[in-house]
């Protein structure tokens, strides 16, 4: 393959990737989910700040850093209107100490509700049917809410210590680090979100690429939004003193659009098999191929991971891989192990090809599909399917008019 063909192949691969991301972004209703998350976030921003500041202030080492942390967040992550929003939120959070025990419980519940909504959105993108429940969900949500301010405080404390060192104080390095720190914190935050929140394994490198795109878009959106507010602030003309509320809501909405787009990119990297080119492998051949690979693995006393099954064929799959796994599990042909691998659940010496046709909701491959599956199916399989198609053709070689004449009149 010469360099022109390589460039052409890469171009088509990138084109399929972009189309895949856009298609799934639309299919998953990400714009609608972003609006729901923006509304929920506005309701929970005061509870989240209150819980975060309470945890932050409980550590003596962070005494005196609460205000710098707030200033850093609103200066670097909320464009233009950050100071106004910050002053309002500080007024609201100052009233938290006057709440009753039930008021505090409601604040914590609202903060956890945001995390639950975020997890549902991520699970929808990653095609996960069930969310976390009970103690595991509470521990994860609470860990994220409680660790975020602590980690941010540690990073600021470490930065302050480094900047005060004589060896760095006279150099430009601290200012360069400070200038780019919002971008790197955004990158870490997005990557962490894509790895931890979905209720399924996500590789760090896949989450990183989604986080990188999201962080770049986030920084670009900050500057674009600030430029718009300075030059073309129509909301201030319309709403006057109340303009801060719709402006802040629109900004939060765009942040969630960017976050969900980054999640779709991470998901696209995770399911590379769905972006393959060429003719698709039919559902029945797909199932048979997986059972064959699991049977081989069983001979060596081991199971196969999801990626092992996906890589069994280089063709794209006509049936969604998650749907295929659920179908095989439902009919008790395979099961998932504790370590996330898959193994056979039946003795295949007692399962015939006919049994498989009756169990699975997929028809046998047609003559045309067999021609496109030479790379994935053995000659023995293709010969068996061909004999079946020929025998089926002989059995059903009767035209519909003749069939209907023999049936007689049913409707009166």
UniProtKB/Swiss-Prot annotation:
This is UPF0761 membrane protein LPC_2650. InterPro entries: UPF0761_bac, Virul_fac_BrkB. It is a multi-pass membrane protein. Belongs to the UPF0761 family. Its main location: membrane. PANTHER family: INNER MEMBRANE PROTEIN YHJD, UPF0761 MEMBRANE PROTEIN YIHY. The chain crosses the membrane at residues 36-56, 99-119, 137-157, 177-197, 210-230, 241-261. One of its GO terms (cellular component) is plasma membrane. Disulfide bonds: none annotated. It comes from the Bacteria. It is found in: Cell inner membrane. Keywords: Cell inner membrane, Cell membrane, Membrane, Transmembrane, Transmembrane helix. The keyword Membrane applies.
